[in-house]
Amino acid sequence: MRLSSICRLVLVLGLAITSFVACSRDPNVRKQKYFESGQRYFDKEKYREASIQFGNAVQVDPRFAQGHYRLAQSFLKLQQWTRAYQELNRTVELDPENYQARVDLANLLIAGHDLKQAQEHIDLLLSKQPNDPQVHEAIANLLSAQQDFPAAIKEIQKSISLGPDRWEAYLNLALLQMRTNQMDAAEGNLKKAVQLNPQAMNAQLALGGYYQARNRLTEAEEQYRRAINVDAKSPDPRAALAKLYLAEGKRSETEEFLKQVKRDLPENSVGYRMLGDFYFATGDLDKATAEYGMLYSEHPKDVQVKKNYVQLLILKNRLDEARKLNDELLKANPNDNEALVYRGQIQIRDGHANEATQTLQTALKNDPDSGVAHFHLGLAFDQLGNLARAESEWRDAVRWRPELVEAHRALAAAALRRGDMDALEQSAKQVLDLQPLSPDGYALRAVSNIARKRFAPAEEDIHKAIEVAPQSPVGYVQMGNLKLVQKQFVEAEKAYQQALEKDPRSTDALGGLMNTYLAQNQPDKAVATANSQISKVSNSSAFYDLLGTVLLNNKKDMKGAEAALKKAAELDKNNSDALLKLGRVQVAKGATDEAIATYQNSIKNNPNEASFYILMGELYESKKDWQKAKDAYQKALDLKPDNPLASNNLAYVMLETGGNVDVALSLAQTARRGMPDSPNAADTLGWVLYQKGAYQSAIDLFQEALKLAEKTKAPEDATVHYHLGLAYEKAEKPTLARQHLERVLKINPNYSAADDVRKALAQLKS
């Protein structure tokens, strides 16, 4: 009996274990476990974790429509729009009757300005769900995107009539009414939304934002405090209240309030990060970095804290620390897009722009909508000298992230480089809209107006820049620039000095003050001013650069210029401007080999600076070291393929060394396109055409070179006359040939090809 009982027990246990193993391998069970886990994370607002679990569910069953839909909702919460779109699309493919997914898809397409495709989904929804209030809300969104606000309001009102208890509809109606300046009606509907769902934080905050926009600041503060009471654990109303304080100029109150938020929400990542984010947003990188360093030590497992700390370390140029922490992030998740963007930033700062483009393009393959990745990819292309591609990336950045102010600043800088003042004004307006309390937008718009001699609006913007940021040098520098252009030197001097009082390290202020003295032919005063400021700020590479420039260009003091520029380079090995000028000084004093050594050392710290290779090539050319000159120019073109100066010089060297004439022609044409006003570019292209036997075309270009030199008041170039004389000889115009060949020897009796000139003249006489 006992043996039989034991056998039965073993049999039962065996069956139970078999059943358990079978269940654990059942794909439907596994799918459901992942789905339920994802739902729990979603309910706790842990959307990244939810997306992983929903992703696991659809990996087990790729046709699990509800899993795809919940994954889409997670991506929407994470603002990963492309992936959300893909999952919504997959949802309606698998379950065409999931009309809520179609509504979400239509709204996402509207947000992405794909109105045609959105209309197709809305047409289907109207035919299938004509009385669904959310369908009419989507129609209202579409009409709003088409700027038809009256029709949009009618649709949202229809949505309310179909679903009068939906607080979201009242909120959307209020937002539309605010856009059409129906402010009183908007207030009523915002209050209705709050009444219908007091827990709806979006409605609570929208009402506070309404009061703030109407400058009813006391009511705004009261509303935000009510929102805090509604959900004491939510960081959102606290963030809104902090922004209100900041908008009122209550910086110290904001700081103290956020310190309290950190104490109130010790377990909420958004809450305890607010203080560090405040320091970052207000430009206090030292405090922000210190705060995040402390947060990282307190919350080492908080990935967002770690990421924000990495970003701050990059901005502080503490690259080794940033690299170490970021490598840890990528080791944990090689496809972490934020960490890939950080790696790209580090590579840019290391001067490895080519590597940065590869890293950032990988990030964009994972998330094509990443405005931040587009922005930094633009910086990498800019470092490589590809401004057109850089601007394209920056435009993509602001398309996906319109609030990304740094991308608007980059576009402003690009417009300034191109001399496109209309584009600069547009970018300045974007900066102003995003940061009305920053002086930068006003200053940029002032720059565009000064360039177009619109002095009155420029001065108005400058006064506004000073008003919003009286402790910043930005407004005072622009006031100095305006007065300098107007030749009001006393006022210019005063403005620049005020800027230096606000920020003794301001290179723009010191440079402007020195230019004011130079404009009055007072170089000694400019030098004295530079030395005076250097005595206050002794570690500024830029200040020594300014001093060296005046000593070189205005005082012709080669020894003093060399000492100042060497100090500038010593303080900042990446100061390419100082290094380039240092080489020029060394060339001027006849130390060609020393200049070459300077450029070679400079390249080690600035490997992507094509100018060093071009100048080095010119020095090798002067030594008749053709191969090294050729290699240097080619390296410059590897970095900047369309660089006109490198193209011109390489074409000329190829002709001098018997290189491929067709390749030289292509290079010379590139140079001519890039430098249409350059006598040298016209001469080089003419010389290539001479080699190809197109003598009349060559003559036209040599004549153009002479005209351009005369126009720019450049000294007569014996080489152009030599080339023109030879071309006239080939064109059988001996009188003109003799005239230009004789001119060569008058300009420079010791011309390098003087013997060939005399030989040609002798042949013409015979």
Q: Which stretches of residues belong to each language-model region?
A:
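Alpha-solenoid helical repeat scaffolds
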Residues: 6-766
